[in-house]
Amino acid sequence: MAIGRDAATTRRAFLRAAALVGGTLAVARTTDAAGATAGATGPALLGRARRTSVLKTIVVSCQENHSFDHFVGSDARLPAGYGIPRGWQNSGVRPFHFSNRTGDGVDPNHDWVSTHRAVAGGTMRGFVANGNGRDAMGYYTAADLPYYYSLLPHATLCAEYFCGVLTETLPNRMVLYAGTSGGITDDVAPANGSLTWPCITHLLHDAGVTYANYNVHAPANYSYLCLWKGNHNDPRLNRTTARFFADCRAGTLPNVVWIERPSPFDEHPPASIRIGEALSAQLFAAIQGGPQWARGEVAILHTYDEGGGYFDHRPPRAIDAFGSGVRVPMLVLSPHARHGHVDTTYSDHGSVLKLIEHVFGLPTLASVNHAFDRSTPRSAGQGRGAAFPPRDGSAKISDLTQCFSVAV
């Protein structure tokens, strides 16, 4: 789920400001001429040469709460073992086609405890018994998601891509931006500007790589990036819907772009999936109609933050005590993507960071963040646990470069 960061715009009433506990790394901050704050990760970037890539802009589009099997597992083009298995069932309930596009109006359980019960030690047989009942086994088809399915012949579909943590939204968004949730396993959000360990914007700023977050139909400070020190009220992270379309037309999208959308545009159940899909079609068409796409400079990474309590049959690997999480869709769109390809290389949300770091010649967050326990204890509390190292330092997940037909 997506959550506005300011108290006045928080969508989930149960979210409250809470201080992040344990394992923090102070990040020095300065203020630039525009009033935006800038991070300093120390000498790690000094003397690093910017590499040259055919990609100049990476757009990260992350929606809400849909697992892979539930969303695209019915596609007949998937290789054996990656789509919904014939005869698969949970507690006697087999996957079934939803008769509507609101998932029967249900938002299945998907917190830390619920997701671990659903994964059931890697058997993936606990989605129904977890308390979600029959609705956890519903899926969609190409008829329900015509735009997304129309992209498949023109994109790489990552069929072995997992979210970051076996839990709900906040920790997974944190992995997407920082490689680690800092030990957080629930949706109780820290206060804006309170996180002091590095996230990807710090690396980008220090390397002179441009970036922006666009709040599409969303209020200011809506992005989880605003949780980090110096990012709250940063104009780079608070660009508007109108600015997005203007930048697409002008060919001025920065090097790294994030797109944030509120409900019902984020596809979070039980909102109609067609609403979010329609907005994605508009946003992607604007990018693809711009001069940067025409020059072959752009890649769009479209994924989902977590599985939302919906079934999937492929077990995640134990990268550390927190994840990976449940398998989710990931589409890689680019003039240089391997069109019509289904990639089966193991990846998770940390892979997005690895691609950004690779393309722009950045160090990993794992290499500059020395605060978190490298041993990663094999237990974690429901709300907080021992902080785990940034996932972009793991050799167990890909950097997504295999999704492109040329070296990037």
Where in this protein do the model-derived segments appear?
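N-terminal pro-sequences and low-complexity stem/linker regions of secreted or lumenal proteins
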Residues: 2-8, 13-408
